[in-house]
């Protein structure tokens, strides 16, 4: 039985992970959980899965959580130290790192330093500090399993093959809700329009990232570190059906792809159970029901955020951390109705233009770059003329 910790258990990845755990009580046991503000859901999860320890992002929420858990024996903690305690709880064999944003960096690093394998769903870990985390992974001899459907697909497609035989990694993207929207109409996109993803059910932030294709840009940067591939070997194809989750091209001209019904439980289960496979409840793919699989190159005029991610990867050093921070500020501002959809990319670009990339030698320096990026993006956001679209 594999004993796991789930950081970010109240988010969409965390909830899906617990569904896998509940379906396989003979294979997985939850030793610790962490959540942010959804205390009611966290309390229900604690009652159902009975972890030894649970952490909340804000220690001030501990008294309220205690009230919700009357009669339940569980150690409660909070803050960064609490998240690290959840990640390194005695007996934990795998950490599911699903905290959204830079808040996931320190506890994920703590797990790696403790020699614990990580199922990685937190994009920011590799986007902002890829070189540092891969050095930690190598130094502490732990395994890093991708949870993103695209990176899981690549991981499965390179099994048994030599890295030097790979000529290209091809990430697929649905294109989101605005794949065919006339460019002139993007100015009037509403929040609800952007949250209406055609294929995937995800959290609000990642759904907006999917609409702008920043999500795919972050995945390009992740792939660079996960698979030790230079930017020129990583490309993106628009694939509206979201059936092929990613592909790998080899020197002999062959392309290996992973196909499946769009459901995050499949890559989560593979990360948890590797090298075995377990049932997930995901509907099997029936190829005879498909009308076709189509592909196209992304239009960077329509999706400027993808181009900004490639730019950040090319400049390297601190630029990806600053870009990521600016994106989080921009998405939050859009969801609050303070800027328009098109101003998301504009805000990120202005923040990047104001930054001089420099080397990051520690996680604290990464967090400092993140803080600089957020502060600068907020200042720039205040100067933008609002395009409020509710």
Curated annotation (Swiss-Prot):
NADPH binds at residues 10-13, 36-38, 122, 124, 203. It comes from the Bacteria. It is an enzyme of class 1 (oxidoreductase). InterPro entries: DXP_reductoisomerase, DXP_reductoisomerase_C, DXP_reductoisomerase_N, DXPR_C, DXPR_C_sf, NAD(P)-bd_dom_sf. Catalyzes the NADPH-dependent rearrangement and reduction of 1-deoxy-D-xylulose-5-phosphate (DXP) to 2-C-methyl-D-erythritol 4-phosphate (MEP). PANTHER family: 1-DEOXY-D-XYLULOSE 5-PHOSPHATE REDUCTOISOMERASE, 1-DEOXY-D-XYLULOSE 5-PHOSPHATE REDUCTOISOMERASE, CHLOROPLASTIC. This is 1-deoxy-D-xylulose 5-phosphate reductoisomerase. It comes from Trichlorobacter lovleyi (strain ATCC BAA-1151 / DSM 17278 / SZ).
């Amino acid at each position: 039985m594999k004993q796991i910790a789930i950081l970010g258990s109240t988010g969409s990845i965390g909830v899906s992970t617990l569904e896998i755990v509940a379906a396989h009580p003979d294979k997985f046991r939850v030793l610790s959980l962490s959540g942010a503000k959804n205390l009611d859901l966290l309390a229900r999860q604690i009652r159902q899965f009975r972890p030894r320890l649970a952490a909340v992002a804000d220690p001030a929420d501990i008294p309220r959580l205690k009230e919700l858990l009357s009669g339940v024996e569980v150690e409660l903690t909070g803050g960064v130290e609490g998240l690290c305690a959840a990640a390194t709880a005695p007996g934990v064999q795998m950490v599911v790192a699903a905290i959204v944003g830079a808040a996931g960096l320190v506890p994920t690093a703590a797990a790696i330093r403790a020699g614990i394998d990580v199922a990685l769903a937190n994009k920011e870990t590799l986007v902002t500090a890829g070189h540092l985390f891969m050095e930690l992974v190598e130094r502490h001899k732990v395994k890093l399993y991708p949870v993103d459907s695209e990176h899981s697909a690549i991981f499965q497609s390179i099994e048994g093959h030599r890295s030097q035989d790979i000529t290209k990694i091809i990430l697929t993207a649905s294109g989101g809700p605005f794949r065919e929207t006339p460019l002139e109409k993007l100015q009037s996109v509403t929040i609800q329009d952007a949250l209406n993803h055609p294929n995937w059910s995800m959290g609000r932030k990642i759904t907006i990232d999917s609409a702008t294709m920043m999500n795919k840009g972050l995945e390009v940067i992740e792939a660079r570190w996960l698979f030790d591939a230079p930017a020129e070997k990583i490309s993106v194809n628009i694939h509206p059906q979201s059936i092929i989750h990613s592909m790998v091209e080899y020197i002999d001209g062959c392309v290996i792809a992973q196909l499946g019904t769009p459901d995050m439980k499949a890559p989560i289960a593979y990360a948890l159970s590797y090298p075995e496979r377990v049932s997930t409840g995901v509907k099997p793919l029936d190829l005879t029901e498909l009308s076709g699989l189509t592909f196209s190159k992304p239009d960077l005029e329509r999706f400027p955020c993808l181009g900004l991610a490639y730019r950040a990867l090319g400049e390297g050093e601190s630029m990806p951390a600053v870009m990521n921070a600016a994106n989080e500020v921009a998405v939050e501002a859009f969801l609050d109705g303070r800027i328009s959809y098109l101003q998301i990319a504009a805000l990120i670009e202005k923040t990047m233009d104001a930054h001089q990339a420099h080397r990051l030698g520690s996680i604290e320096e990464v967090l400092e770059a993140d803080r600089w990026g957020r502060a600068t993006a907020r200042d720039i956001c205040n100067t933008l003329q609002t395009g409020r679209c509710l």
